Each structure stands twice: as C-alpha cells, then as structure tokens.
Design a protein with these regions (language model features):
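N-terminal strand-loop-strand
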Residues: 1-56, 105
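Short, charged/polar surface micro-motifs in flexible loops or helix N-caps
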Residues: 14-17, 43-46, 62-63, 98-99, ...
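Generic C-terminal helix-cap and adjacent flexible tail
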Residues: 14-17, 166-172
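Residues that scaffold the ATP/ADP-binding catalytic core of kinase and kinase-like folds
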Residues: 48, 64, 152
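The catalytic Nudix box helix
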Residues: 55-91, 105, 145
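Active-site-adjacent beta-strand/loop module that shapes the phosphate/pyrophosphate-binding cleft
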Residues: 93-130, 142, 164, 171
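NUDIX/MutT-family hydrolases
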Residues: 117-159
Length: 172
C-alpha cells in the first residue's frame, strides 16, 4: 500500500491590473491571472533552494482518515492558521516519483494570513554531529502566478497545476 498524503491548493483569479476576483469570462486564454498558494519547504536541505523547492501544503494520513480532513489538518499545522472555509473540490490523486499518492483538494479563495507559523520536525544537523535541531516544515508561503509556480513547485506536483488549469478553464 503506498504512502498517502493529502493537501490543499488554494487559487485565486487576478485581473491584469492586479485586482483580485476577476470574472472567469474576462480571463485571458493563457490564465495569466491564475495564482496559487504554495509553501517553501523548511529545513537545511531546502534552505538555499528556490527552484522546485516549494510544495502544496500537505501531509500524510492513515487508513481510515478522510483525505479532506487530513488535508485541512495539515494545512493548519503548516500555515499556523486554519484553511479558509470553502467548498473544496477534489482535484485528483497524483502519484509522486517516490511512489507516494497525494490527494489534492482545491478551492478559490483569497487567503491572506498575517503570519506563517509552521509546526517543526527534529533533525540531526549537521549530520553525524549528535545535535538534534528543530526546523519548521514550512519556512515561507505565498501566492505565485501559475506560470511562476511551475518553476517553484517540486516537479512531481506539476500535474496538480495542469489539473487546476483544466478545472478553471472548464468551470463556468
């Protein structure tokens, strides 16, 4: 049985002049106005990386737990604030190169937290030093245009953006 993870991908539509909440019928074909909320992974491995070092807020869950409940829990743990109340659309399941299966839920929301305060994880660093340090799972999170997010997200999550673009284009 593969390791399972669930996450939330928030998105918003921004008009070319930067005004949020533009109508889909005024969106350009390229979806330049589509922005997504993604998070930079924490810890020393990711500290100086930017390209393909960002992720959809997500986390593992166990058999018997509902994926949306897990996604909401993980979002709150990683952002330090609950996910916004919304009608979350199941965007799909996406197999990662590691074999992990991620279930992603999407919602159109303008999420603007005052701060990001992630939970932490212990790690011996430097390796072999015997020193256990605690690092945030997430050290930054923000909105990116969909085209820029493609350069930031870990490569295994790029199909999630493809699914979101298909959804936004199809949604009346």
């Amino acid at each position: 049985m593969p390791v399972r993870s669930a996450g939330i991908l928030l998105y918003r539509l921004v008009a070319p002049n930067g005004v949020e909440g533009t109508s889909r019928d005024r969106m350009p074909e390229s979806l330049d106005g589509l922005q997504v909320w993604i998070a930079h992974m924490g810890g020393p491995f990711w500290a100086r990386k930017d390209a393909h070092a960002w992720s959809i807020p997500k986390g593992e869950y166990t058999e018997g737990e509902h994926p949306l409940a897990a996604a909401l829990r993980e979002f709150a743990e990683e952002m330090g604030t609950p996910a916004p109340a919304a009608d979350y659309l199941p965007l799909g399941e996406f197999r990662q190169p590691s074999g992990k299966l991620i279930t992603v839920f999407a919602a159109e929301q303008d999420f603007q937290p005052e701060t990001i305060s992630s939970n932490t994880f212990p790690l011996e660093w430097p390796r072999g030093s015997g020193q256990i340090r605690h690092y945030p799972e997430i050290d930054d999170a923000r909105w990116f245009p969909e085209s820029e997010a493609r350069l930031k997200l870990v490569k295994g999550q790029l199909p999630v953006l493809d699914a979101l673009v298909r959804h936004v284009r199809a949604d009346p």
